[in-house]
Design a protein with these regions (language model features):
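Substrate-access "cap/lid" subdomains that shape
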Residues: 6-8
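Catalytic-core region of carbohydrate-active enzymes that cleave or remodel glycosidic bonds
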Residues: 3-4, 24-118
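Aromatic- and carboxylate-lined catalytic core of secreted/periplasmic carbohydrate-active enzymes
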Residues: 58, 67-69, 85-169
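Short beta->alpha connector loops
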Residues: 11-15, 35-37
C-alpha cells in the first residue's frame, strides 16, 4: 500500500481529537473518547459535534464504556463493584452509530489487559480474558454490524430525534 495507513489521534477522555488536531493534514478521521465516567453519557453528541466540523471527516468513538470496567473508576469515591455491562456497551454503540459514526470500538476491561489469574490487574480486572472475550457485549456488536451492513449506507442519515429513550427524553 505504499505505507499509506489511516491515522487519527486518540484523545484523553472524555475528549475529541478535533479539539486538539482538527486541522492537521495527516488526520484521516476524527476520534473521540466518550469515556468511562458514568452510565448514559450520550455518545451520539460527540459524533454529532465532529460531523458538523470542517474539514469533514469520518468519526469513530475510539474508547467508549468498556464492558466490565468499574463505572467512573477515576472519579473520587467511585464504587469499584459497579461495572459497565453489556447494556452499557450496546447503548454506547447504537447511540454513536445512529448519530452517524463511521464505526464503533468495543472494549472489554479484562480483554484489553489480557488479564489472567496470577497477573497484577489494572483498573479492577477480575475475570480471565479468555472467558471475557465471549461476554454478551462482544456478541451484540456483531448484531449491530449485521444490521448496519444490511442497510444502504449511501442513503442513511443520522436521526437522533427518532430515539425515544436516553438522556434527551
Amino acid at each position: 500500500d505504499g505505507g499509506r495507513h489511516l491515522i487519527t489521534f486518540h484523545p484523553r477522555g472524555p475528549g475529541l481529537s478535533s479539539a486538539q488536531v482538527r486541522d492537521a493534514d495527516w488526520l484521516d478521521f476524527y476520534m473521540n473518547q466518550s469515556s468511562h465516567a458514568a452510565r448514559d453519557l450520550d455518545t451520539g453528541l460527540y459524533v454529532e459535534h465532529d460531523r458538523a466540523l470542517t474539514p469533514r471527516r469520518p468519526v469513530i468513538d475510539g474508547e467508549p464504556r468498556y464492558e466490565g470496567i468499574p463505572v467512573g473508576f477515576y472519579n473520587e469515591g467511585h464504587d469499584p463493584r459497579l461495572r459497565f455491562d453489556d447494556d452499557d456497551a450496546r447503548q454506547a454503540a447504537w447511540w454513536a452509530v445512529l448519530a452517524g459514526a463511521a464505526g464503533h470500538t468495543y472494549g472489554n476491561n479484562n480483554v484489553w489487559q489480557m488479564w489472567a489469574p496470577g497477573r497484577d490487574p489494572a483498573i479492577g480486572a477480575n475475570r480471565p480474558w479468555s472467558d471475557a472475550i465471549d461476554d454478551p457485549g462482544a456478541r451484540q456488536m456483531g448484531l449491530l454490524r449485521r444490521f448496519m451492513e444490511a442497510q444502504d449506507f449511501a442513503t442513511l442519515e443520522p436521526r437522533q430525534d427518532l430515539i425515544l429513550d436516553g438522556p434527551r427524553h
